[in-house]
Amino acid sequence: MSGNTLGTLFCVTNFGESHGPAIGCVVDGCPPGLALDAADIQAELDRRRPGTSRHVTQRQEADQVEILSGVYQGVTTGTPIALLIRNTDARSKDYSNIADTFRPGHADFTYTRKYGLRDPRGGGRSSARLTAPTVAAGAIAKKWLAEHHGVRVRGYMSQLGPIAIPFVSWDDVPANPFYAPNAAIVPELEAYMDQLRRDGDSVGARIEVVAENLPAGWGEPLYDRLDADIAHVMMGLNAVKGVSIGAGFGCIAQRGSEHGDEITPDGFVGNNAGGVLGGISTGQPVTVSLAIKPTSSIRVERRSVNSAGEPVMVQTLGRHDPCVGIRATPIAEAMLALVLIDHALRHRAQCG
């Protein structure tokens, strides 16, 4: 089966290509009775939208969402919700020079080997443009989780390339284009990105996502554990090369006496588990960390081959994010929310 749908009860099927007429998704399984209009979804899409600062792609897409079905008089009906986002600023001619070559680090090679052909325009189906419908679906999940369980999902950037970003305040996160929780470091980030653009290169990032106010009990052992599903969908995001939960890889250097979160009558002491034990939520915040690789489309020439196997030099022109991690925070939030609503509904179905 093709891998375009996620979820068991709250299912999201994503469709479209970067330079096609439109992209979108169908959300099947949303409970009826949720007050919902386009503005609820648009607010999240605007956080991810391209062209909002000099540090991201200058492709100018309004990303205006259209609700085609599943909502009547401002309320979800329980039937499939179809969401459409039209592409209005595609420049396919920018990709004519790489239509027959494979960009190092990109999915050009693997899509061709799997399907026997590929759409080279903007990366086609493998483009990060396809995360917009994910954010749209995630907006619905966020709203339902907040209204029915008081769950809050939010994220921030904790590292840009070699620059670590110490956490200071959630209030700083929406006040800068990096989603950095530290206003004092923003000038350094801007200077770094300005030089990176002059170099024609790209860089990676680290994103943290936190879900608060979850009840204990969500998750379906053994194979649909909450943390397993989180890791699964996060690795489905463009450019994600690593996922850790709680202490993550830091647990390697910890002893059991340190890693295991002690329990008192007042609750857990620490959260090395990242809010999940045995694949089931503990009631503590669920904490997820993502490693985002550097963007593959850069102006620096690199060696590759064309579809005939002949050696070529590749240089990617056009408009690209020099750090895709800058816009990854709302995308990662959406993915976490989609996993959580699915598990909330599954828990309710089995355990009441």
Swiss-Prot record:
Pathway as given in its UniProt record: Metabolic intermediate biosynthesis; chorismate biosynthesis; chorismate from D-erythrose 4-phosphate and phosphoenolpyruvate: step 7/7
GO biological process, one term: chorismate biosynthetic process
PROSITE patterns: CHORISMATE_SYNTHASE_1, CHORISMATE_SYNTHASE_2, CHORISMATE_SYNTHASE_3
GO cellular component terms listed in the entry, alphabetical order: cytosol
Keyword Amino-acid biosynthesis: yes
Residues involved in FMN binding: 125-127, 238-239, 278, 293-297, 319
Keyword Amino-acid biosynthesis appears in the UniProt entry: yes
Cofactor note: Reduced FMN (FMNH(2)).
E.C. no: 4.2.3.5
GO terms of molecular function: chorismate synthase activity; FMN binding
Swiss-Prot/TrEMBL catalytic activity: 5-O-(1-carboxyvinyl)-3-phosphoshikimate = chorismate + phosphate
Binding site for NADP(+): 48, 54
CDD domains registered for this protein in UniProt: Chorismate_synthase
Cofactor: FMNH2
Sorted UniProt keywords: Amino-acid biosynthesis, Aromatic amino acid biosynthesis, FAD, Flavoprotein, FMN, Lyase, NADP
Residue spans crossing the bilayer: none
Record note on quaternary structure: Homotetramer.
Family affiliation: Belongs to the chorismate synthase family.
Functional note: This reaction introduces a second double bond into the aromatic ring system.
Classification via PANTHER family: CHORISMATE SYNTHASE
Name of the protein described by the UniProt record: Chorismate synthase
Source species of the chain: Bordetella petrii (strain ATCC BAA-461 / DSM 12804 / CCUG 43448)
This protein's encoding gene: aroC
